[in-house]
């Protein structure tokens, strides 16, 4: 008996069928053939097969099927080797596999991600956020929290937690929703797995919330389109600038779900649905001054929308779902309208053409197509149609003949803020503005004017007007803030 127990192994036998998986306890083939007749006869007297031994202190995994349970004892002649492979493995239903889930259910509800993917999602989530209170609290018991989150996802017990709502006032009052840190890890987990298959189908002219496609990419892309259609500013052309009305709070979740289902399925679709249809208004904490919420227009508040509409601004999942939704619009404009010169950044889009009549026809087509297919509409107050020679204002930059400059409103705000803000915040803010101004092709004069403001406040500027330094007095006595 001791010898048989030592040679037995717990082996998972994967059935070659699309119907079920069966786990059996079988011996190694090379050692099962060496069983003696006496041992087999002794086991028969105990009423069980000589090819199976019970493993002491070994419990199978959840869902495993042990073929030794509920088996009738039958007489085995001495010297005849028996095997648990007597149970037929095939497409024919068998009693021993009745508790195993079907392949369709297993494929749909099985969480097919690794723990390494969850760890990578955690690192992606904490990037630039490690000093936040929620990230620090999660990291205090990092291993335990990650293991608990992994178990919840694997067992289907995960539920989104409380969100935080606050209001920003620059450039205009807007609601911002921040999910709990552990929920943001799940957002990154979903994003890391499914985003590549969607990005592969996106057009090259869609920007925002796509790796390598920020505001600078959008400005350069539009500038290249203008140079192409005008033959390096030698021919006239017109542009049509469109904006979607109340975009994020008007998104129909059912439309997004139907677009997601075209490329993902199973457990990942279930997780995407759970994140998509979660209503943060059911459990949230309002931070900041409550009266600021009244400054947000009612039609732009998520709290004023029906349950099936609106995505919380601030979550990675919302930005990704918005790109999935508007990819349908991109495909319609590029292939339906056959618009060759087109660029979109979130809900702002620019169409270029030689004929203003063609652009008016395209505008009418888009106005009719959006409500029917996506449940969205255009903002008529932000629709612009004029020659490109007058300048195209897009993603904070103005593209004019042979130059690209920073929007005047942004530059004037930079001068005003750096001249009035506290000294302890000036160093970081000024360098941020220098980096923003450098994105334009013609920005030397603007950077020089910003540098003059900083020099008057005691800061040193490099000769190319690309960055500022703290003055020598700010280092005395370890005081980095007082100038």
Where are these regions (language model features)?
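Right-hand nucleic-acid polymerase module
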Residues: 2-9, 15-18, 24-26, 31-34, ...
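Basic/polar, acidic-poor N-terminal "presequence/leader" segments
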Residues: 57, 66, 70, 74-127, ...
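Active-site-proximal segment of RNA-dependent polymerases
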Residues: 105-108, 191-252
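A structured, charge-rich N-terminal accessory region that forms the first stable segment of a protein
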Residues: 117-153
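Short, conserved non-catalytic motifs in the polymerase core
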Residues: 128-136, 161-188, 201-213, 279, ...
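Active-site-flanking structural segment that lines cofactor/substrate pockets
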Residues: 144-172
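Conserved polymerase palm-domain catalytic core
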Residues: 145, 225, 229-346, 351-365
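A common structural junction motif
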Residues: 264, 367-376
